[in-house]
Amino acid sequence: MAKTMPKKDVVVIGFGWTGAIISKELTEAGLNVLALERGPMQDTDPDGVYPQTMDELTFNSRKKLFVDVSKETVTIRHTSADTALPNRQLGAFLPGNGVGGAGLHWSGVHFRVDPMELRMRSHYEERYGKKFIPEGMTIQDFGVTYDELEPHFDFAEKVFGTSGTAYTVKGEKVGAGKGGNPFAPDRSSDFPLPAQMNSVSAMLYGKAAESVGYHPYNMPSANTSGPYTNPYGAQMGPCNFCGFCSGYACYMYSKASPNVNILPALRLDPRFELRTLCQVTRINLAADGKTATGVTYIDASGNEVIQPADIVAVCSFQFNNVRLMLLSGIGKPYDPESNTGTVGKNFAFQNMATIKVFFGKDQHHTNNFIGAGGNGIAVDDFNADNFDHGPAGFVGGSPFWVNQAGAKPIAGTPTAPGTPNWGSGWKKGVAEAYTHNVSMDAHGAHQSYRANYLSLDPTYKDAYGNPLLRMTFDWQPNDIRMNLFMQDKMSAIAKAMGGQAISISGKKEGSHFDTNSYQTTHLNGGAIMGTDPGTSAVNRYLQ
């Protein structure tokens, strides 16, 4: 029989960035907040201390900080006509687990949204006409504007200790010719810290980008360029470019995370409680089916526990938020055949391409073992709608950047085209390329489509007997057209760098989604916000 705990004002499901932020906001409002985290307690000390945290085999290859896919995963198929199978080996994306969630192992790249992308359908219809949006593409406006969100972006950067170079502040140009982004929207204040130093790779890239007419700028980075104390009193140390960011906890307290930037303040508040190893299985509803009354979870001993609360904040990873809504009977499940329902609708990912430039050993020493997760130089000339999409014939844009995050000895061993895949020739190629290459990425936007959606799997279940989430997803023609376009535009920078060889990794005509090729962990949609309950799962306040 399930044990019922004393009622709380608020129960928060998941303690990553969203859970930490909402917990801090609501405790400051005077509410008693309980956060439930499915994974273990994690903190810089003892879990991320030097030198243990700089262990590529444990954290990257064996994925210590990520979700255990033997217990909980998603099933994947390309189309509704296919049979989905469980994803038992992480590859295309890396959901986090434990206190901090994916916010503990992220890199620290910290952009703001482009104002246009918050009203994307309206913008494209106004500029290019309704027929420009392909049939089956289901993009819609968010129901909020950049101006409404700007004060919150500003405060978040102060909490994160973000390093960067503003271009305009309150309409005044302050970063022209100094590394600011001429395409960036206006800001109410500058970044809390100046931009980090740039790597040799980034400087070579920036010079080449400028030579072909693009507009390079310093990437905003949630890796500190100097000592910093945030508004909550959390202290951060300056980044030392150790190269162990993405997939790791930062032993220098330099990378923003819920663990470093918010949890220290929450621990001092008696109104806050954090329980770990608590797997939430249901959001409990009142008899009206519309009011949340709390949650049911499985504790570390395997006992079922009911936690009543006046407010339930669903703050777990994107996949799990959608799954919990479906398991709990919240909202109407999306049906792609009739294009009705909202929960599971508009699932989207990211559309990546990578180009590597290989130099001769007497050209440039790029020292790729040096790095910071969010640091680098980017161009936005082909991001958002900063260019004419009409002749290009697709929806979406992409920034290009060089973000030298630190090449590790197991995975960070690229070789130039033509190098043997094994043996002495491969070893020679690795040695020649390791500190003589530059890698650049197009982090392309990915649109939502009627054919791509999330639902409950009818066959496979998790360790607790609940249906797994099923991901129906594949690249669409618009994605491939955009990716090929971005490869071409980014190649201009690569060629201008004057290397001896170039390799391109991106989509081709007929490409399908591949679970082995890492894209990012930027998974979106499924419980989308908006102003129309007929097309959105939650309102503009995420209720």
Task: Give the location of each predicted region.
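Glycine-rich loop(s) and the adjacent beta-strand/alpha-helix scaffold that form part
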Residues: 28, 32, 39-56, 261, ...
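Conserved redox-cofactor binding core of oxidoreductases
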Residues: 59-61, 67-76, 85-92, 121-125, ...
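FAD cofactor-binding and catalytic pocket of flavoenzymes
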Residues: 78-95, 99-102, 106, 112-121, ...
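A glycine-rich dinucleotide-binding beta-alpha-beta segment and adjacent secondary-structure elements
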Residues: 7, 219-222, 241-245, 281-286, ...
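A short, basic/flexible loop-to-alpha-helix module at the beginning of a structural domain
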Residues: 1-7
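N-terminal Rossmann-like FAD-binding beta1-loop-alpha1 element of flavoenzymes
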Residues: 8-35
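Conserved N-terminal glycine-rich FAD pyrophosphate-binding loop of Rossmann-like flavoproteins
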Residues: 40-65, 96-107
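A generic secondary-structure signal for well-formed alpha-helical elements
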Residues: 25-26, 30-34, 40-46, 113-117, ...
